[in-house]
């Protein structure tokens, strides 16, 4: 029987950098933008990047994407159940 090969999803050039925010960072993010956590865009817990990070529903991810004009920009996603 074939075994499943491990693949580092973050090694792929098209996958942006992801990280889980701490509770303190999440509070600061919500305060800075004057929003509720429910107003953040969502990402499913089954997303390959979420699974690779080990994030769980309720966690907030910071995603760093490349930009031709700004260099990098950050966006945030709330991990939700499927």
Curated annotation (Swiss-Prot):
Question: Per its record, what are the GO molecular function terms?
Answer: DNA binding; DNA-directed RNA polymerase activity
Q: Where in the cell?
A: Cytoplasm
- Write down the superkingdom of origin: Archaea
Q: How does it assemble?
A: Part of the RNA polymerase complex.
Q: Could you give a single Gene Ontology term from the biological process aspect?
A: tRNA transcription by RNA polymerase III
The record's Pfam families line, in alphabetical order, gives: RNA_pol_Rpb5_C
- What protein name is recorded for this chain? DNA-directed RNA polymerase subunit Rpo5
Q: What does this protein do?
A: DNA-dependent RNA polymerase (RNAP) catalyzes the transcription of DNA into RNA using the four ribonucleoside triphosphates as substrates.
The UniProt entry lists the main location of this chain as cytoplasm
The UniProt entry, under PANTHER family, shows: DNA-DIRECTED RNA POLYMERASES I, II, AND III SUBUNIT RPABC1
Q: According to its UniProt record, which protein family does this protein belong to? A: Belongs to the archaeal Rpo5/eukaryotic RPB5 RNA polymerase subunit family.
Q: Which reaction does this chain catalyze?
A: RNA(n) + a ribonucleoside 5'-triphosphate = RNA(n+1) + diphosphate
Q: What is the lineage of its organism?
A: Archaea, Methanobacteriati, Methanobacteriota, Thermococci, Thermococcales
Name its species: Thermococcus celer
Q: Which GO terms describe its cellular component?
A: cytoplasm; DNA-directed RNA polymerase complex
């Amino acid at each position: 029987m074939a075994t499943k090969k491990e693949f580092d999803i973050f090694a792929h050039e098209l996958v942006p950098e992801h990280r889980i925010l701490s509770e303190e960072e999440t509070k600061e993010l919500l305060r800075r933008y004057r929003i509720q956590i429910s107003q953040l865009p969502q990402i499913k817990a089954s997303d390959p990047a979420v699974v690779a990070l080990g994030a769980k529903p309720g966690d907030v991810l910071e995603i760093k994407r490349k930009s031709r004009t700004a260099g990098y920009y950050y966006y945030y996603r709330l991990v939700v159940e499927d």
